[in-house]
């Protein structure tokens, strides 16, 4: 029939053999004695033997045995022939009818082996290895597994049976691997991402501590899950390669990091001060050293040491020019009885002061006022000389006082001498006179 395989049903004769010494009968393998009829009946091994066929094989009962065939193979059963209609087949010569006292031969082994077995040279029924003899019907994609009295068609690990074919199982679809999975025919392999190593179970991945094994960083290595990062010591910054560290030039970040000068060093920096200053505890600010107070100056005995920001000045004693007379260490007076003093200021008072270079403006830097106020008198304040650059002006702040104002920033070092004149006018007694403060201004080199 088209589409079917004809499976030959083997008819096996069941011989009822008397047991020597008594009249009890015995059947060959694959048959059981029916005591009611005295006949040998076929044993259905497919029902009595647990898992007679394994895998995707189907058990087909045969007379005196059974057959394991693929489930996909259709079976056509031929006409059943009763083995008991003629207890002796044509293949076996008919035995002579027994006499009244037959002499039965002693039979220790069956003469016929059931299906799936064959008789060896010692008349023993041994299993037929269908897999070794290539007498199985397994598909080329399957493997043959021999069983007692038959065989089973199965698939190797990594394959499953689908419509009679062994198809590869894609283990990667089922998450067998923790990270990377590569499917191969009949198997799979797990791998790990960079920074991980495969554990002994072949599936899970463990982080690699690169800092402990390689220490790829120049300075500090910090392990992370699956990787690592490099860090630099204070004063260094990480380069673009993520491994090396280069010195950080802190001085380039801001011009206000140090009050005077910032000196960069590998991994750090420090502030320095110019001569005449010391660095304060904040390590950035500079403070003037008072050389005069600490007697760290070069002035001679006749000179006066005047401390400046960042230095000092050795001031000579004042010299009063004719017709002036020196009346103190810092004052010259022109006597009223001297005719040459008529148009001259009555007194010249010497004063010294210092300002830092580039001081912000406008700035009130000096105060001037009359010591005595006369009835009917008023006062005029002005810069008599020394203001050629128009960097100062006098602002009268009251009837008898005025303030010297610096209007432009002055860059040092520089020495300036201004004659500040106070004119006294008294209309009651028709008097007009003046006095001068000779102000010497020392501008330091630095703005601190």
From Swiss-Prot:
GO cellular component, one term: collagen-containing extracellular matrix
Signal sequence interval, chain numbering: 1-23
PROSITE patterns, alphabetized: ASX_HYDROXYL, EGF_2, EGF_3, EGF_CA
Membrane-spanning residues: none
Molecular function in Gene Ontology: calcium ion binding; integrin binding; protein homodimerization activity
Protein keywords: Calcium, Cell adhesion, Disulfide bond, EGF-like domain, Extracellular matrix, Glycoprotein, Repeat, Secreted, Signal
UniProt superkingdom: Eukaryota
Motif stretch (Cell attachment site): 54-56
Subcellular location: Secreted; Secreted, Extracellular space, Extracellular matrix
Post-translational modification: N-glycosylated.
Region (Interaction with LOXL1), start-end ranges: 245-448
Alphabetical list of InterPro entries matching this protein: cEGF, EGF-like_Ca-bd_dom, EGF-like_dom, EGF-type_Asp/Asn_hydroxyl_site, EGF_Ca-bd_CS, Fibulin_C, Growth_fac_rcpt_cys_sf, Nephronectin_domain
Pfam families recorded: cEGF (PF12662), EGF_CA (PF07645), Fibulin_C (PF22914)
EGF-like domain boundaries: 42-82, 127-167, 168-206, 207-246, 247-287, 288-333
One GO process term, biological-process aspect: elastic fiber assembly
CDD domains according to UniProt: EGF_CA (cd00054)
Glycosylation sites: 283, 296
PANTHER family from the UniProt entry: PA14 DOMAIN-CONTAINING PROTEIN (PTHR24050), UROMODULIN-LIKE (PTHR24050:SF28)
Family of the protein in this entry: Belongs to the fibulin family.
Subunit annotation: Homodimer. Monomer, homodimerizes in presence of Ca(2+). Interacts with ELN. Interacts (via N-terminus) with the integrins ITGAV/ITGB3, ITGAV/ITGB5 and ITGA9/ITGB1. Interacts with FBN1 (via N-terminal domain). Forms a ternary complex with ELN and FBN1. Interacts with EFEMP2 with moderate affinity. Interacts with LOXL1.
Role: Essential for elastic fiber formation, is involved in the assembly of continuous elastin (ELN) polymer and promotes the interaction of microfibrils and ELN. Stabilizes and organizes elastic fibers in the skin, lung and vasculature. Promotes adhesion of endothelial cells through interaction of integrins and the RGD motif. Vascular ligand for integrin receptors which may play a role in vascular development and remodeling. May act as an adapter that mediates the interaction between FBN1 and ELN.
Name of the protein described by the UniProt record: Fibulin-5
Lineage of the organism: Eukaryota, Metazoa, Chordata, Craniata, Vertebrata
